[in-house]
Each structure stands twice: as structure tokens, then as C-alpha cells.
């Protein structure tokens, strides 16, 4: 008997992303500026019904250091800026919108088919309603440099909302699969970023700088269909994205060494 059997496999997918975009910029006297962006994207990852999506952004700035009242100021540069816009995410795998039958076993490999028979198993259920995940973000920030640009940095405050989250929705095992790819819930982030740099030493042959970078972020889930959780890790409305739901540990039982839980 020949224990080696040649196997052949093949796979073909149409893949692509088509985008149209336009951008407009305006500047007045090097003091005030504005930018507008619009784009329209199509992804092969979604069915034809939901393939196209529109996204846009607007931003503005004010170079305060260019104003007359800033003459003789300690600031070498001072800029206030703000923006608001949307963007899309299409990170699902290419086959999540249709059902994909798959061989559960064959004659030349160990399989899970019933009684060793050739079987067909449904590896996933199709969902042709999947659509783009949308991210909307607002940001307000300030950039500055002072004392002959020896001290410089930036501060930013942002709010970010992601809707139509890509998540696996738990299903009953009687469907033949345990989950369904879906757009479920929203994720809200807000926080503060900053960075500061100070030149300790400035010289022709040596420069030494100290930089401090920091971030504070708070996030929570919303619009989930169940208050008792939806996915592994137990995402709950009002709770953070990666919250864990576990039994509280109470230590070790001194009598027998077993773990104890509340």
C-alpha cells in the first residue's frame, strides 16, 4: 500500500477596492486655513447592495502666532486646530457575506464526518446585509513652541464613535455553526493626547532633548442587542470593549489548598 496520496486544492476570489475622492484647501494670509475632503468607496467584501459608502471630513486651523497682538510674545509658534470627519473599515474576510460549504472529512484524512462517511458541513452562515463599519471622529488641538523653540509640544482632545461594529453574533448550535458575522453595536472613545519636548542641551556637536508623551482614553460599548453580553470577553452596554467577566477569586483554602471563589 502506498501511504502517500497527492492532494490538490484550489481557491479563487475576486478582490478589489474602488475609490473616488476630492479635496479642497483654502488659506488666507497664512493665518486661517480650511480643508474639505469627500470620498466614495466600494469594496468587494460586501454584497452589491451595501458595496458603496460615502465618507467626508472637514478641518480648520488658526495660526495665532501670525496675529499682530502676538508680536514680542514668548511663543515662536502657536496654532489652534480642529477637525471632524468619517472613515470606513472593511476588515471582514472576503467570504463572510455568503455561505461556504466545506468538506468535514475525506478518505485520506481523519475527519469529523458521521461514522467515517463523506460529509458536507456548513463552515459559516451567510449574511448579505453586512456593510461598512463607520468611524466618526472629532478632534480639537493646539500646537506650540516657545523660548526660541526650546520647549514645544501639542495637546489634543478627541471623541470617536464607531458604529456598525464587525462582531460575531452567537448562534444556536442547531444552525450548524456557532456564530454569524454581523454589524452589531457601537464603540465610543474619548480621550486626551499630549507630547512635550524640551531641549536640555543645544550645541554645534551635541543636542540633548527630553520628550514626554501621554494619553488618557475611556471607551464603552453601546447598542448591543442584549444587556447580558454578546461575545467572548462579555462585551456589555456601558462597559469597555475588552472587559472580562470572571468569577471573583477569594484565595486558597488553607485546609486543603484548593482555590476559592466568591
PLM features per residue range, with description:
Residues 1, 256-262:
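Short, intrinsically disordered, charge-balanced linker/junction segments flanking boundaries
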Residues 1-253:
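Extracellular/periplasmic, surface-exposed regions of secreted and cell-surface proteins
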Amino acid at each position: 500500500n502506498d501511504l502517500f496520496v497527492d492532494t490538490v486544492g484550489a481557491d479563487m476570489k475576486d478582490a478589489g477596492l474602488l475609490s473616488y475622492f476630492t479635496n479642497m484647501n483654502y488659506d488666507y494670509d497664512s493665518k486661517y486655513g480650511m480643508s474639505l475632503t469627500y470620498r466614495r468607496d466600494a469594496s468587494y467584501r460586501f454584497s452589491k447592495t451595501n458595496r458603496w459608502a460615502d465618507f467626508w471630513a472637514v478641518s480648520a486651523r488658526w495660526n495665532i502666532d501670525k496675529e499682530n497682538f502676538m508680536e514680542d510674545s514668548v511663543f515662536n509658534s502657536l496654532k489652534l486646530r480642529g477637525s471632524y470627519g468619517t472613515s470606513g473599515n472593511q476588515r471582514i474576510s472576503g467570504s463572510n457575506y455568503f455561505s461556504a460549504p466545506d468538506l468535514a472529512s475525506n478518505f485520506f484524512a481523519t475527519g469529523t464526518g458521521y461514522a467515517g462517511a463523506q460529509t458536507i458541513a456548513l463552515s459559516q452562515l451567510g449574511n448579505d446585509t453586512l456593510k461598512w463599519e463607520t468611524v466618526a471622529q472629532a478632534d480639537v488641538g493646539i500646537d506650540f513652541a516657545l523660548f526660541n523653540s526650546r520647549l514645544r509640544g501639542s495637546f489634543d482632545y478627541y471623541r470617536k464613535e464607531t458604529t456598525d461594529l464587525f462582531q460575531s453574533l452567537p448562534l444556536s448550535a442547531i444552525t450548524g455553526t456557532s456564530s454569524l458575522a454581523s454589524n452589531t453595536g457601537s464603540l465610543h472613545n474619548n480621550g486626551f493626547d499630549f507630547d512635550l519636548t524640551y531641549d536640555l542641551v543645544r550645541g554645534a556637536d551635541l543636542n540633548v532633548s527630553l520628550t514626554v508623551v501621554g494619553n488618557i482614553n475611556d471607551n464603552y460599548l453601546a447598542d448591543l442587542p442584549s444587556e447580558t453580553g454578546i461575545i467572548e470577553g462579555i462585551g456589555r452596554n456601558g462597559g469597555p470593549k475588552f472587559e472580562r467577566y470572571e468569577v471573583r477569586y477569594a484565595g486558597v483554602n488553607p485546609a486543603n489548598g484548593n482555590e476559592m471563589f466568591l
